[in-house]
Amino acid sequence: MNSKINHSMSLAKPDAHALSIKQRIAIALGITGLFILALALFNTNFPNKSLFLWLSLGLIFLGTILFANDAYLTKLEGIKNDAVWFKSISSRGTLGWITGIVLTGFYIVLYFYPQYLGLTSDGSSNTGIISLFDPLSYLLSGNPASQWFVYGTLYTVAILAFGYKFMLKYRHNRYQQLRTASVMFFQLGFAFLIPEFMARLNESPNYNLPYYDLKSIWPLNYYLFDSWSINGFLSSGTLGLTLLIFGVVSIFVISPFLTYKYGKRWYCSWVCGCGGLAETAGDPFRHLSSKKLSAWKIERWLIHTVLVFSVIMTTAVVYSFLGKDPNSYWLTQNVFLIGVGVLLSVIFAVVMLFKRDELGKDAKY
């Protein structure tokens, strides 16, 4: 006899939070794919790296798709947030803490200790998990994999796989489906494939293109005006100059116009890879964000502080790149500083002239 007390007031059988057999199989497939990556991390020498890489990524995809199909296609259309507060991974439970620690550790190693992932700096072959991605990197760009290629691949896999899951969850809402398809497209095409194809162009002596995600707009693309980036564009002929001009136009024309018409959602929800990951892989965790007014105020202060910092640092970077001799440069350091001052003054004047009332209602702390 089961003596467990069920506090549900449902007259019918309460919702079961247990996994179905299909979901368990799907999780097993996904974990197997992750296990292959873990084996590579510990420098396992696979006999056929291409086979095991595709097997790993394929199992992760297949597991996510099968799980999503059983979770949503067996139910009526509508938002399903079943048991998010009862699952350990999505309710600050043990699995959630373990996942957070693992991801934080991965980012620390990725940025500061890539050699532990198998990256070599002496010209020798990669090892570890980075070597597992070498075949795919050679296929796309003709170069060995780096820690950033590994990260970009896993990032793209997460958006595509969980984007499919998100589209099933919101299959009753065409807007959400189109928006999700958009971020999946931009991540796969603009953030992942096109930069790799651009790197292959560098095999020609006529090109020295830097890494450039076309959809990444300043200040998100904070390195656009670094000297190595500008020199790479300018030394790559018409294509390089076109890409540099497109980057500048994106900042001063495309982004302001679309933001004025549609708000920041046109970028954060439809284009940006950061928002794309948050809306796909991060969807099961959105309820954990703080809803306090203080959290919202802190966010506003941080956002605008970072923006001011970005403007100052970018101005300093471009200033240091330019020359001083007006006979050698049409855009000198002094002309640039005057231009920045005039631009900021015009923006301030326009806002105060046409948006003073709206600013008075919104700019509160």
Predicted feature residues:
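Non-ligating segments of multi-cofactor redox enzymes
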Residues: 2-365
